[in-house]
Structure formats: C-alpha cells, structure tokens
Regions:
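Feature activates predominantly on carbohydrate-active enzymes
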Residues: 1-105, 109-113, 154
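Catalytic-core regions of glycoside hydrolase
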Residues: 13-14, 113, 125-264
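Short, histidine-centered active-site or binding-site loop motifs used for metal coordination
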Residues: 83-85, 121, 225
Length: 264
C-alpha cells in the first residue's frame, strides 16, 4: 500500500524527451488524487541536469519551475530538484562542491526544500587522477562529496529532504561499496534503490530488509516501472502494477515511480 510510505511519489528520471511544464502540472494534480507527496525533477536528457550540471539554469526556466513549485503546494505535493553530476565530477574539488550547492540554492530561492544528488549510470571506479590520489575508492569519494554538499546546503537553506542515488543502485546489497556508503553517509540523507534489478519484476520484502540493513537507513525505492526508455521505447507498459510486497513500508521509507515518457 502506497499510503504506508512516508515518501510517495514520482521521479521524472527517464531517458528521452522530458515532459513539458504543462505535463508536469497535470502529473502533480494526478499525484494529489493518488495521495502522493513528492515529485522529483530528474530527466536524463536535460543537459543542465546531467552533462552540463555546472551551468546555471536560465532565469526563464527557474521562473517556470517556481510556478510548478507553487502548483505543487496547492496540491500538497513537494517539488524536488535533482542534479546528476557524476559523469564529469571531481569529488575532491571544492570548487565543484560550491558550484553544485549554488545551483541547488537557485532553486531554494524559489521555494524548493527537497533536493536530490544522483550518481547513477556512471563508471564504478574513480576516473580523475586527483581523486585516485585522495580517496581509496569510489564509495569514500562519494561519501565525502555528498556529505559536504548536504551540510553546506543545510547551513544555507531550508532542507526538508535530501535524497542520494548511489552508483550501485540494485542487486546484491552485501557489497563493500554499499557498506561504506551506509557507514559514512550522513544519517539524514535518504538512499535510493531500484530493487533486485534495474527494472525489477518483483520487489520482495527481503530485498528491503537487506538493503536497508546494508545502508543503515530505511531505503527509498526508485521503481523503474512503468518506465519505457532505452531498449523499451517501442513498448507501452500499461499492465497491472504487481509484484511489490505489501510489507515494503515496514522496511523502507519511500517509493518513487519512474513513469513512461507518455505518462500524461
């Protein structure tokens, strides 16, 4: 039951053409009807979200996003801004930490209180020589960077929630990477997880128990259904929503659905 989760919502996290602001507004209204409370802006093909994350969003976009935030307030749905800097990130670069915080703050100024840092779909090892010299592995670097960003942002703005997507976001929870993330990450940061697979046919209760134990916090699920990007682009996923254990709210904090490009 979705109502059992503290965080209930939608992550616009697919590859392909992003929704328009009008489509997002319709999504917010539908989310309110379904008693959802969080929408996350994270379209992979928005260059300023991912590949050009250091570039500020133009004023016109921020003004349109402010209208979306206000629309969300009317319907009881928080609108979160996610950034995905991992493809070009130097984890130990204080200038890049500052750049990311500044970009978040540009949305804090228009009323955003929920923020996300996504480090998914990037290499599993450190790519920059300076990071290889400064950190023992990817997990240590990500813990350092994420904690720095969160603590600076928290000191400068009103943060209700901060969600982190790890580079290993599905499968085996008994890994050294997740162990380091769990022990080192600030306890107030939420961690995202897609389940046994990237697109999980089923999400059993045991999965939630295991990954929440590994990460030392109740996980927030990023459920890649009914998303139909990539090799699934020719498909429409309109079948019944099944295979999710009804006990999941007992071992996880939230559930975000990654929808189809054609969702509305």
């Amino acid at each position: 039951r979705m109502s059992g989760f503290q965080i209930r919502g939608v992550v616009e996290g697919f590859y392909g053409a992003p929704w328009s602001m009008e489509e997002r507004a319709r999504i917010l209204r539908e989310m309110a009807r379904l008693k959802m409370n969080l929408y996350v802006y994270a379209p992979k093909n928005d260059l300023l979200h991912r590949h050009q994350w250091e570039t500020p969003y133009p004023l016109e976009f921020i003004r349109d996003f402010e209208k979306l935030v206000e629309e969300g307030k009317r319907y009881g749905v928080s609108v979160a801004m996610a950034l995905s800097p991992g493809l070009t990130l130097t984890y130990g670069d204080s200038g890049q930490i500052d750049a990311l915080v500044r970009k978040y703050l540009s949305f804090s100024a228009i009323g955003v209180k929920d923020f996300c840092l996504f480090l998914d779909d990037i290499p599993l090892t450190l790519q920059k020589e300076s990071d290889q010299a400064a950190f023992s592995d990817l997990a240590e670097a990500q813990v350092f960077f994420t904690n720095q960003v969160y603590e600076r942002l928290k000191n400068l703005s009103d943060v209700t929630a901060f969600l982190f997507c790890p580079t290993q976001y599905c499968g085996d929870s008994l890994t050294a990477y997740l162990e380091k993330i769990g022990t080192g990450m600030h306890p107030d940061i939420d961690a995202l997880w897609t389940g046994p697979q990237v697109c999980s046919q089923t999400i059993p209760f045991e999965d939630a128990e295991a990954v929440s134990r590994a990460l030392r916090r109740k996980v927030v699920y990023w459920d890649n259904y009914p998303v139909n990007d990539g090799s699934m682009a020719a498909e429409l996923h309109i079948g019944p929503y099944t295979g999710r254990d009804p006990r999941l709210p007992l071992a996880s904090r939230g559930f975000l659905i990654n929808p189809m490009n054609q969702a509305m």
